[in-house]
Regions:
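Glycine-rich phosphate-binding loops of nucleotide-dependent enzymes
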Residues: 1-166
């Protein structure tokens, strides 16, 4: 991954098995966020990115989401002018398209993990605290029932007790 003349990530190879958790640790500017964005096709990269044996280089972020790949970006990227519950349901957009059942049950599971979101389900996302927005971003990702979940700075703004739960 390059930013002009600066090479942010070089010679990186990752392999993640089903059910496995991998952590990228490094100082600011080491390329952790760039790596996640490169995997999701949000930043151009050289080399190859494959998932379940398929090359992803020419895929759109939307098609990757439909394959079950979800990124919770560092800056949350919520729909600030929409209510909490609407943000959560947008996380399940591809499931709506497939007419999947169980969305309400999954919403209740997210509310059980983050009770504060249920209390504030009619509140505009942009008016919430940073920690509440982080809960919402993670909850929205979980609504997609991801096969591959990429979390960039997942504990940002969260209380230590909630970090332990996640």
């Amino acid at each position: 991954m390059r930013y002009g003349a600066v090479e942010a990530v070089r010679n990186l190879s990752l392999s993640v098995a089903e059910g496995e958790a991998i952590t990228l640790i490094g100082p600011n500017g080491a390329g952790k966020s760039s790596t996640l964005k490169g995997i999701m096709g949000l930043e151009r990269s050289s080399g190859a990115v494959s998932y379940q044996g398929q090359e992803l280089k020419k895929r759109t972020p939307e098609s990757l989401a439909a394959k079950g790949m979800v990124l919770v970006p560092e800056k949350r990227e919520l729909f600030a002018s929409m209510e909490v519950e609407d943000n959560l349901m947008l996380g399940a957009f591809t499931r709506f398209q497939r007419r999947e059942k169980g969305l309400r049950d999954d919403l209740e599971r997210v509310y059980a993990l983050f009770p504060r979101l249920k209390e504030r389900r009619k509140q505009l996302a942009g008016t919430m605290s940073g920690g509440e927005q982080q809960m919402l971003a993670i909850g929205r990702a979980l609504m997609a029932k991801p096969k591959l979940l990429l979390l960039d700075e997942p504990s940002l703004g969260l209380a230590p007790l909630i970090v332990g739960e996640i």
